């Protein structure tokens, strides 16, 4: 079952800075699922795409991370799991060679996430669980769009 509260954290290990004003984009696509108590069938709900707050004038240096600006409340829907995919448009795609790693900060009924804590340092330092990885394999184009494989998250 997905945690009661959660938030995405994306780490850029692509070897290059991602810059919004040069056409760099981040998009996390997610479809959540639950077993319908009436029919017993799996019901899917496409959640809003999440850009993690990566907006105009934003940049994400190699080796740094962005903590999403959306904290997802799962207390009403009680989703059991979801499928997630990372979609990146890399403005320095020809020079990039590495990964984008997606982590999940989790919280319980108190709503406190690891990313909320005053001692939060980074996804790896705080032991967040990696949920998906996009391996950047350039096709020789800048402003190229790549998508990770779809991963099941529970």
Feature locations, PLM:
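Surface-exposed, low-hydrophobicity beta-strand/loop segments enriched in small/polar/acidic residues
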Residues: 1-154
